[in-house]
C-alpha cells in the first residue's frame, strides 16, 4: 500500500502493518498472484500472458496494473549511490538504511511526497534540508499564506528549507556516494 509508505518511513508502522492481503488471502480467493514478473506478451485470443522468464498464465479476466515511475531530476549525479527515489517499499527501506548510517539528507522537492519523506527522515534522526524550485512549498496545493504556516510548523520540527533553488548537479564524495548538491546561480 503505497499511501502508507510514509508511516513506515517515519517508524510509525511496519511493512507488515501496511500489507493489504497476505499470501493466504490470494490462495483462499482462487487468485494466482505472480509477483516480480515482467510481462512481455499478451495473447488476447488465447487469453494468455507471457513473462520474460518464460512464465505463462491463462486468464478469464486480465487486470493490467502497470504502476508508475518516480520523476528523477535529469542532472549529472542522479545515478550516484545514495540518490534514492520515493515510490515503493524498496525505496523506503533504502531511506531507512540511510537514516541509520548517515546524518544529513537533502530532499529535492517540497510537494506532498517530498515533505513526507523529509518528515520521516527527520523522525529517524537525520538533519534534513528540503530544496524546492518554487517560491513556496506545495505551491500546487496551497496558497502562500497556508504554505508559510506549514513551513513554519515543519521548521519547528527541525526541517530546513532552501526555496527558489534549481539543482544543477549532485556531487560525489570521496567514497563515491552523493555528498553535495550544486545549484544553478
Give the ranges of each region predicted by the language model.
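Short clusters of hydrophobic/aromatic residues that line enzyme substrate/ligand-binding pockets
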Residues: 5, 9, 73-75, 83, ...
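Hydrolases whose catalytic domains are alpha/beta-hydrolase-1, hotdog thioesterase
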Residues: 116-117
Amino acid at each position: 500500500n503505497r499511501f502508507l509508505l510514509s508511516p513506515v518511513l517515519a517508524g510509525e508502522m511496519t511493512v507488515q502493518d501496511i500489507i493489504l492481503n497476505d499470501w493466504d488471502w490470494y490462495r483462499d480467493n482462487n487468485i494466482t498472484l505472480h509477483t516480480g514478473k515482467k510481462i512481455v506478451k499478451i495473447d488476447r485470443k488465447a487469453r494468455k500472458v507471457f513473462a520474460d522468464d518464460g512464465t505463462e498464465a491463462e486468464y478469464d479476466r486480465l487486470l493490467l496494473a502497470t504502476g508508475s515511475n518516480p520523476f528523477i531530476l535529469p542532472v549529472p549525479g542522479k545515478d550516484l549511490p545514495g540518490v534514492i527515489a520515493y515510490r515503493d517499499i524498496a525505496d523506503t527501506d533504502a531511506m531507512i538504511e540511510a537514516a541509520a548510517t548517515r546524518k544529513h539528507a537533502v530532499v529535492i522537492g517540497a510537494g506532498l511526497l517530498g515533505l513526507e519523506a523529509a518528515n520521516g527522515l527527520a523522525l529517524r534522526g537525520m538533519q534534513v534540508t528540503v530544496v524546492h524550485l518554487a517560491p513556496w512549498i506545495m505551491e500546487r496545493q496551497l496558497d502562500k499564506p497556508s504554505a508559510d504556516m506549514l513551513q513554519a510548523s515543519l521548521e519547528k520540527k527541525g526541517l530546513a528549507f532552501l526555496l527558489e533553488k534549481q539543482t544543477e548537479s549532485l556531487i560525489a564524495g570521496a567514497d563515491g556516494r552523493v555528498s553535495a548538491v550544486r545549484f544553478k546561480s
